[in-house]
Amino acid sequence: MRVLLEVHQTDGPVEAAQRAVRPTLRRRFYEMVTIAAGEAGHEGQNGYRLCLDGKPIRTPGRRTLAAPGAELARALADEWAAQGEYIDPVKMPLTRLANTIIDGVGAAQEQVAAEIRKYLASDLVFYRAESPAPLRARQAQHWDPLLSWARQALGAEFKLGAGVVHVAQPAAALDRACAALPHDPWRLGALHAATTLTGSGLIALALLHDAITAEAAWQAVHVDEDWNMEQWGSDEIALKRRGFRFAEFNAAALVLRTLGKL
């Protein structure tokens, strides 16, 4: 089992924005959810503004909730339209991600990219179990194709380690992987979310570049956890927590898919 020796505890812009969107239930006060196309969106760019009964939705930072693409805007509108008597942020992972991106990523893209690089430096897929052999084989099955993709598509050659001992990655490999990071706040923010949810910047990058599906990515993330549950039985609390995180991961994957590689 792989245990990171580097603990990524940051107080960066993404974390600050996430704290501002902690779930609190509020009674639903609107009837209609609409999209106003061509209005000023994030950072003054044209986008698709979300409105409740004709009034623009504001983020916790008092910015306009506007998406850069029509499909993404429709997905956001669907979340708001699906709310019942109360507005439940837990059931709105895409809106929470959008708020985080708009409030926390736009003015801090270099810092967000640096956080992704930290994850890449001690990525999940670089650390393999010393035993048993069937677990090592399963890790290789899910993770080796990602390493091959990084080598062929990005020119990044990473080193593998066994157990819990940290393995320093070549600066050139990290530089080449980071050169594939997006430069707009929406995709960068979604990539950061996928990275922190999976513990793997490489899996997130592969998702961005269509080298892996969201379902396969999520399965790859849980190789070790699934193995343990097969050996010792399932943990209902852990599975419930995984379900919440999967919803958040799917929101990030949706942003990456709808906005494309650009």
Walk through the language-model features, giving the residues of each:
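Internal, conserved structured core segments that host functional sites
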Residues: 110-176
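Short cationic amphipathic helices and targeting signals
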Residues: 63-67, 125-127, 134, 203
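An internal, amphipathic alpha-helical element
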Residues: 166-239
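An N-terminal structural lobe/cap that precedes and organizes the functional/catalytic core
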Residues: 2-107
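Generic secondary-structure signature for well-ordered alpha-helical cores
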Residues: 81-85, 151, 155, 207-212, ...
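Conserved active-site and cofactor/substrate-binding residues in soluble primary-metabolism enzymes
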Residues: 67-71, 75, 107, 141, ...
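Expand to "…catalyze enediolate/carbanion chemistry for C-C bond making/breaking, isomerization
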Residues: 3-4, 222-223, 229-262
